[in-house]
Amino acid sequence: MTRESYLAAGGYRVEKGPEDYDLWLRMLESGARFFQAPEALIEWRDSPSRLTRSHDDYAETQMRATKARYLSRLPAVIENGVILAGSGPIGRKMAKLLLAENIEIRGFIDVAPRKIGSTALGFPIWGPKDLGKKERAAILLGCVGQGKRAAVRTLAKSAGYREGHDFFACC
């Protein structure tokens, strides 16, 4: 992080929620670019007592609300709405947060046969074979637990979505 990129994003803000994540998203908005270093640069000690794991400001609900707030400012999301991959609890929670930000939900994609053809929060649930065919202009958001993220990425890629462009694995 450079001083210029830090200042361009407005620095840290004191508000409820994950301040580091908020800063990174504002840096991204202001034009900063991120990359993965080819090798580990530090060793991180992660204990259960760390604030990230124990303070309400860093709870999953705050992380999701921060993600929804920034996703709702993306021009493509504003113009085209979203489809959420995952109609379970995580997807429904993200949908509610996006609706509160006035983002149009076009529907859900799910792999569970019993859900396909039904609705979640009043929006249609389509199967994986419909991905890329239903509401293709909408931005795809991966809203599943950690164990299923790779499968959503593979499915999105096979349907022609590009991560960071028209697909975001946001949960």
Predicted feature residues:
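Hydrophobic, well-ordered beta-alpha structural blocks that scaffold small-molecule cofactor pockets
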Residues: 20, 37, 43-171
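Conserved nucleotide-sugar donor-binding
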Residues: 1-9
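Short, conserved catalytic or interaction motifs in soluble domains
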Residues: 11-14
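Hydrophobic residues within well-ordered alpha-helices
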Residues: 27-28
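Acidic donor-binding loop at a coil-to-helix junction in glycosyltransferase catalytic cores
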Residues: 17-23
